[in-house]
Swiss-Prot record:
The keyword Nuclease belongs to this UniProt entry's keyword annotation: yes
Annotated Mg(2+) binding sites: T82, D84, E97, Q116
Catalytic activities: Endonucleolytic cleavage at a junction such as a reciprocal single-stranded crossover between two homologous DNA duplexes (Holliday junction)
Residues with site note (Transition state stabilizer): K99
Keywords, sorted A to Z: Cytoplasm, DNA damage, DNA recombination, DNA repair, Endonuclease, Hydrolase, Magnesium, Metal-binding, Nuclease
Protein name: Holliday junction resolvase RecU
Keyword Mitochondrion among record annotations: no
Function field: Endonuclease that resolves Holliday junction intermediates in genetic recombination. Cleaves mobile four-strand junctions by introducing symmetrical nicks in paired strands. Promotes annealing of linear ssDNA with homologous dsDNA. Required for DNA repair, homologous recombination and chromosome segregation.
EC number: 3.1.21.10
Signal peptide: none
One GO location term (cellular component): cytoplasm
Amino acid sequence: MVNYPHQLIRKTTVTKSKKKKIDFANRGMSFEAAINATNDYYLSHELAVIHKKPTPVQIVKVDYPKRSRAKIVEAYFRQASTTDYSGVYKGYYIDFEAKETRQKTAMPMKNFHAHQIEHMANVLQQKGICFVLLHFSTLKETYLLPANELISFYQIDKGNKSMPIDYIRKNGFFVKESAFPQVPYLDIIEEKLLGGDYN
């Protein structure tokens, strides 16, 4: 084949594809995004007002090139002191944590911290509705586990072992995903927690 006009032979190059790096910090973001979309749905339909709490940030270093242009150059996320979400539904205070795992048989208890367990106990003491949404991404299953069930399990060994999915299925409630809202947890609160079916 003639490569007119310069008679050059084109070199073919093979580009190596880089292995995709797994970002473990954001692995729960799709579940979190589904919860946020659910909360937006509840808000827009005037069913509930529930928001994600901002993660506390510790500012370490600020650069002041000009007095009016302060720039944060170093900051770190602090460990959250309470739960992920809070709000109000029909006059009831709602407070919950959301966790996701790829495991098929258990939810790692190392995902829960002592101060979160203490916070949940305090919410229950004040008659608030407190729970955790547990998502098993490999199984595509989500459960609402009342906080008192989480606290009972946590007290066995202060959160050193994993919570078996059988315990979650027995003591929690399956959340059937839908299009709108994606994670309809208010249905369970209404039917099971406020409806008197749960002690």
